[in-house]
Each structure stands twice: as C-alpha cells, then as structure tokens.
From Swiss-Prot:
Keyword Transmembrane helix applies: no
Organism field: Clostridium kluyveri (strain ATCC 8527 / DSM 555 / NBRC 12016 / NCIMB 10680 / K1)
Name assigned to this protein: Small ribosomal subunit protein bS16
Keyword Ribonucleoprotein carried by entry: yes
Entry's Gene Ontology molecular function annotations: structural constituent of ribosome
GO biological process: translation
Disulfide partners: none
Family that this chain belongs to: Belongs to the bacterial ribosomal protein bS16 family.
Organism taxonomic ancestry: Bacteria, Bacillati, Bacillota, Clostridia, Eubacteriales
C-alpha cells in the first residue's frame, strides 16, 4: 500500500481549512484515511499549523511520502530538523 501524508479539505465554501491525514495514495482527496495527524488553517491570520510531530516522524520513517504542500508545511513548522534531512 503506497501511503501519503496529505491535506483533506474541510470547511465551508470559500472558507477552507485542512486536516493533515495519512491516506492510501489511491483513495480520493476527501475519502478514506488511515490516521489524522493534525490540521492547517490558511484563512486565519496568522496561519495555524498544528500536528503531532511524533506521529508524522513515525509515518515518514515507515515510508509514507508527504505531498509537496505538506512537506512545505512541515519545513515551516521545523520538522525537517527533527528528521535529520
């Protein structure tokens, strides 16, 4: 099973927020997921990014691939330093 860490869109029309989830790469964007590890709200000022770092590191070390957007969010939150990459 190819696993990705990606964003799942939630919220109202024109007021989105996103949950950071671990999901099978073949499932739809808002479909089934394995685990929820955090959320991202781009609408608020300042932008809110909260996630469980331990779960994120565990999934990445087990082979989960973060999408480009999630990778940028992790870098912004300082997770890159904890992974040693």
């Amino acid at each position: 099973m190819a696993v990705k860490i990606r964003l799942r869109r939630m919220g109202a029309k024109k007021a989105p927020f996103y949950r950071i989830v671990v999901a099978d790469s073949r499932s739809p964007r808002d479909g089934r997921f394995v685990e929820e590890i955090g959320y991202y709200n781009p609408v608020t000022e300042p932008t809110i990014i909260k996630f469980d770092e331990e779960k994120a590191v565990k999934w990445i070390k087990n082979g989960a691939q973060p999408t480009d957007i999630v990778k940028k969010l992790f870098d912004k939150a300082g997770l890159k330093d904890k992974l040693g990459k």
